[in-house]
Swiss-Prot record:
Outcome recorded upon mutating C1321S: In LCA8; also early onset RP without preservation of the paraarteriolar retinal pigment epithelium
Gene: CRB1
One annotated GO biological process: cellular response to light stimulus
PTM characteristics: Extensively glycosylated.
Name the UniProt record assigns to this protein: Protein crumbs homolog 1
Segment forming the signal sequence: 1-25
Keywords: Calcium, Cell membrane, Cell projection, Disease variant, Disulfide bond, EGF-like domain, Glycoprotein, Leber congenital amaurosis, Membrane, Repeat, Retinitis pigmentosa, Secreted, Signal, Transmembrane, Transmembrane helix
Lineage, broadest ranks: Eukaryota, Metazoa, Chordata, Craniata, Vertebrata
Assembly and oligomerization: Component of a complex composed of PALS1, CRB1 and EPB41L5. Within the complex, interacts (via intracellular domain) with PALS1 and EPB41L5 (via FERM domain). Forms a complex with MPP4 and PALS1. Interacts with MPDZ/MUPP1 and MPP4.
PROSITE patterns: ASX_HYDROXYL, EGF_1, EGF_2, EGF_3, EGF_CA, LAM_G_DOMAIN
Effect noted on mutating A1365D: Found in patients with early-onset retinal dystrophy; likely pathogenic
Record note on what altering G959S does: In RP12; uncertain significance
Species of the source: Homo sapiens
Its job: Plays a role in photoreceptor morphogenesis in the retina. May maintain cell polarization and adhesion.
GO molecular function, one term: calcium ion binding
Amino acid sequence: MALKNINYLLIFYLSFSLLIYIKNSFCNKNNTRCLSNSCQNNSTCKDFSKDNDCSCSDTANNLDKDCDNMKDPCFSNPCQGSATCVNTPGERSFLCKCPPGYSGTICETTIGSCGKNSCQHGGICHQDPIYPVCICPAGYAGRFCEIDHDECASSPCQNGAVCQDGIDGYSCFCVPGYQGRHCDLEVDECASDPCKNEATCLNEIGRYTCICPHNYSGVNCELEIDECWSQPCLNGATCQDALGAYFCDCAPGFLGDHCELNTDECASQPCLHGGLCVDGENRYSCNCTGSGFTGTHCETLMPLCWSKPCHNNATCEDSVDNYTCHCWPGYTGAQCEIDLNECNSNPCQSNGECVELSSEKQYGRITGLPSSFSYHEASGYVCICQPGFTGIHCEEDVNECSSNPCQNGGTCENLPGNYTCHCPFDNLSRTFYGGRDCSDILLGCTHQQCLNNGTCIPHFQDGQHGFSCLCPSGYTGSLCEIATTLSFEGDGFLWVKSGSVTTKGSVCNIALRFQTVQPMALLLFRSNRDVFVKLELLSGYIHLSIQVNNQSKVLLFISHNTSDGEWHFVEVIFAEAVTLTLIDDSCKEKCIAKAPTPLESDQSICAFQNSFLGGLPVGMTSNGVALLNFYNMPSTPSFVGCLQDIKIDWNHITLENISSGSSLNVKAGCVRKDWCESQPCQSRGRCINLWLSYQCDCHRPYEGPNCLREYVAGRFGQDDSTGYVIFTLDESYGDTISLSMFVRTLQPSGLLLALENSTYQYIRVWLERGRLAMLTPNSPKLVVKFVLNDGNVHLISLKIKPYKIELYQSSQNLGFISASTWKIEKGDVIYIGGLPDKQETELNGGFFKGCIQDVRLNNQNLEFFPNPTNNASLNPVLVNVTQGCAGDNSCKSNPCHNGGVCHSRWDDFSCSCPALTSGKACEEVQWCGFSPCPHGAQCQPVLQGFECIANAVFNGQSGQILFRSNGNITRELTNITFGFRTRDANVIILHAEKEPEFLNISIQDSRLFFQLQSGNSFYMLSLTSLQSVNDGTWHEVTLSMTDPLSQTSRWQMEVDNETPFVTSTIATGSLNFLKDNTDIYVGDRAIDNIKGLQGCLSTIEIGGIYLSYFENVHGFINKPQEEQFLKISTNSVVTGCLQLNVCNSNPCLHGGNCEDIYSSYHCSCPLGWSGKHCELNIDECFSNPCIHGNCSDRVAAYHCTCEPGYTGVNCEVDIDNCQSHQCANGATCISHTNGYSCLCFGNFTGKFCRQSRLPSTVCGNEKTNLTCYNGGNCTEFQTELKCMCRPGFTGEWCEKDIDECASDPCVNGGLCQDLLNKFQCLCDVAFAGERCEVDLADDLISDIFTTIGSVTVALLLILLLAIVASVVTSNKRATQGTYSPSRQEKEGSRVEMWNLMPPPAMERLI
């Protein structure tokens, strides 16, 4: 049983071991390729084979074992036509060899001829009989020149430079430290000696390093090390830096290298007389206590002032045997013990309290004193002011209104130490305010009780609200219920009786308002037995007069017009002085006059018993008559107007308090009418309102109550008759008179006035050329500038004064003459308009024709036609003088010509002229209105006709113009006038000849030349201008006889009116020979000039007759004037010459050159501009010159704004951004479109290759050095520098990483990964091992039986060994290779791309 159990146990172990092995075998079988889905094109993968075995679904396609590629690419005959398919050995690709005439990858393109773009890169296509052939440029090859030959294939660039292939060439980009075409020249960076302060320079590749000596630092060893940086010096000493050292400058009192020792200043024992020396820092002090001495060194014997005898902080001064106290201000006494009392003079005003500054006990108690007591400031006092005052002496009143205490809009008035508020009336709320601060509402006017627009003023007194009425003018009473206005209607008065006031020093007054238009009127009269006072208007002014005992004592007046119908207030106050006051809106201030009181005795000036207002009761009572006769008073007109608010001795006067019978023509109220409102004077005079009526002050020549009548005018010279008026004076007028009259005339001459007697002519006044003239015997004649004969009415005045006679027009003084004094006597005669003696009249301007009205001698009217009711005192004698001022019928003679219509005017006529006629009588025809001249000509009116004026243009080829007189010229030809502008230096302008007479005007040697021989003269006259005239500008020329009235005369030349004129020295005749059929040539050429005049010539005038360039043109009006020069030649004349050189205005823009062609101009434009004025900017961008940029047009140029990466005028240059690159440490610069990048070399990285990858080692010296990379050890062996490389590196500088994969150590398709000094094989899924040499895919059945046999034998021998062997076998796969099937199956095969790094640059010390 036990054995059976053992057998069962053995069978169990064997079976279990077999199952484990089978499991592990299946898990390790080579089925990984099927898991990776390597079979393509819907094929099926077969497991358990060494390699893939794919069953392809389409066996006809000749696919490989993975069913993804064809074993033979030519299997499907991909080449077209008769092309031959060639299989590339070792590759699954093919190449088609095309027959002639075909091309393309599969020979699909037929080549028939050189088609478009058949040859690339500029190759030239050559037509072959079979197919075209491309002749390639240098640097390219291939059938179509499509292959760029790589010139870099031979690696021409040295020292790690980067070769850039070009077209038929190459470029080497050197790493820093090398230069030359092939980068074969090393750069010595130490050549410029960059290291300072004797430092050692190490030359490296592309850079240098400075080995600094002791005490220097910095990149170039330029910085000295500051040894004072650590602050080694003590006790305030100053550290001085030196080269490799420092020095300490000790402060006074210290010693030592670091100033650490303090000097003992007491060592010299400076203190005397037993004084104790106390040492300090750089000083000492002596303590003299108990020695009896004082001073810095205890050297001075203690003075008498030591006992402090002086009081009040006074200064004590010792002398030989005494002392003196120097007191502070405010103190006195031998020891300054007396305090002066500055308040004794009571300096503080407004009850201010005076406090002395020396009162120390008051400090801190009174706020006006300083904060603390000081003897230095104890002199003086301060004033403690009462509330409301300030200032040093309380002299300033504080403005209590500054705090705005008044409320509700009240106005604050500042008072001494106080204020008061003037409270307003609030119109919006209709509220009155009162109280000290206007804070109380006053209710007294709640129920308004004031009448007649009186103003209610509320108040609050004794707890009661009340009011008072402020009455307007004309009312009084507590409620303004009593009217005070009185109306005086003339010859009336108001008698007021009052008790006498006899107290000396009493004050009485008179006050009233009045309104009147009277200039003379009595306002008030007061009197007693010996004194009377009169207030009256004299010439509109207020007058106050006082008489005492029939003698005038006081006479006051105010020179301000009060007779203007407005209200005026006047007041008289009798006190110690008499004051007259006028209050008027037109007075800027009160009008006041004062005088001393007229009484000398104890009697009061107020002792008046009777007062009369508005007038006196003349003849009314015996008392009144006696009163007037007693004082012999001149009568003053009674007042007419209104009085109101009359107060006598402060009492209101109204009709109610006047007794019956004490007034006459006085009514209550004020009745006034504006009499002038209806304009009763008819605008012929000034209306004067007389209160009860009106009066017209008539303007001359009107008269009558309403100025309706007019003084009759006298008509002189009616229908050209001769007449005059005689006035014989019937009284004497003395030596001062005024004679005036109205005058109207259109004649320039005529006698106006003559004053004389039978033997003597006093004065004459007449018209001379329309102006007034005046003459007296033995005086010069006066002729004024004023023109009188304009047909208007003028007021002429003559004022005769002693030694002087003045002439006026209205109020304007026209002038005066000095004359002897004479008197106008009775029997003298005034003549107006003429004199009886016709011959004498003609000598004084002739008979006057016109009207004279309102003649006045002083204020007496001398009427031509007096009214019988006027009782005229002077009866005139009239000769051919009619009434009124009717004018003559001037149209009676039909004065208008050419169909004009006559209109009669006063002593004149006017004509309504037909079209194109003018003149007073339409006698002038406006020929130019008919447009008689051709285009380009200007019509110029001349006497009895017109001329066509134009500036002619001569171009040098147009030929001369011939003129000839028409035979009707009768005037004297004494001058020639013309204008021209030319640049010719020699040319003839005008030429005429009729032997022996000759005329020539030309330009010779740039100057104007004039020749003339005429009349009976045997000499030829020549004149040459002083200035050149061929400057192209206009010149105006006048050639004239200096004496045109003589048969022969010198001639003068005027050019542009510039003085001096050129005058001939000989005389010759006029130009009259041109009137006799003489040919006149204009614009001829000079003898030595093949061309004629080239320029402009204006129309020439000879004696005022034009040489017109236009003959009588068909269709135009022929010139009607008799005197003409005719154009004989038929050649047309070009007109339109410009008056000025148009080029002066600079019409050519942008620097264009202007050429004056006389009738216009021509602009020669600079580069970049075109157009008539060179105003058009030529667009240089039109041709698109910018290849890689945007074009901006400029003047005669363009500017290209290049795209990034391009430059050049036309953006044609590709920018080499590496020219100024910053690539360091031998890096290669790679240029891009917008910049560059650095290809780092060796052990460097970063944007500019300035950071090291691994530390480097430098050995050698300043001349020869070597840098080892990648941790190499630099050693010097037998004077040769070598790098001992770490395992895995090689090269001269250890710059090369040894490629351990170069020998292909990995088998069975394993991928070799190069590592540092080793390699790693990435095995295929079916292999393992360090080199993938272990095959994991043996036959599964063979493995099973071999394993079972081995296990059986082992179990039979040692059961335990079999179990161990089974466990070891099961774990075998887990320790072999580097492959993880699960990861590879999930993520696919791992591929690592290793950067191939160029060798680093060699660095060495030079």
